[in-house]
Amino acid sequence: YSFHPPRSLTTGRHVRSRESLGDYIARFTHEMEDGTRLNIHKLRYGASTIKNYKGFIIQFDEFCKAKRKRFDFGDIDLKFYDDFVAWFTAKDYSINTIGRHVKELKIIMRAAREEGLHDNGLIESRKFRVLTADVENIYLTESEIRAIANLDLSDNKHKDIARDVFLVGCYTAQRFSDYSTINEGNIRTLESGQLVIDLKQQKTGNHVIIPVRPELQAILDKYENRLPKSYEQKVNKFIKEIAREAGITEKIEVSYVENGERKTHLVEKCDLVKTHTARRSGATNMYLAGIPTIAIMKITGHKTEKEFMKYIKITEEQTAMELMNHP
């Protein structure tokens, strides 16, 4: 394979590129992993983001093999976009997964352009868009959370730990990377006597202070203020089983894409529970308890009320009740 430098879309001249797109994607991801490339908050990328980009490398490589072509910077045009999306659609990937891979490619292309490796601006076209679709991100009600908390899991240490770590997420409304690593260094007492968790969010660097409710304090006491080490993949596996044991089996309608068509089917709620459900549940239940939105945002780290309201799960009926209670 021989690489020919792409032509500038504005001048028509060749732009000098020291490495191919494939090589740059590999370097970009490696630098994310070793910490030499930071995110927009000037912080190291989280493990889940790095995992997504590694997945993108595999998918991009498979796409190149399927098309029998090594795509380079100058090849990323609207025809490429249409082919890329069609290829994923034919493989029954969800709209949001396809959108995530398009977004990752756009981020990589922008970074390479800033580094002077190409002058291809077609990714900024409105037609080169990141596809998104609303997904059925559920939340657990306070009664469902209590059902999980009340289960006797003393005969299974791993499940017991997974349950407790998940509940910490429900009580703090933090991301797994933050709520699963809480230790004595994050716990302090305010002058008022209120016990709080004081932490810096790993993804954004936001400083948040969360009041410790009695249920949370019981878990912290159980582990002497240092949660046992847990792995997201394991907690994701166990929490579905735990939710089923707690009787959280309501049927939920979910949509998916098959052969480019949107279809729906029913899934038991327990099978939709995952580590991030804890954060969404915590934020939603705080809102339903009447805590002011701005106060909850101080805890979750959301920057705008619009962003926050899109994040929490409020039904049309709950919205109507909120309006009735606040004339």
Give the role of each language-model region:
Residues T172, T181-I219:
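Conserved tyrosine-mediated DNA breakage-rejoining catalytic core shared by Y-recombinases
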Residues R110-G121, G169-G193:
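Short, charged phosphate-coordinating catalytic segments
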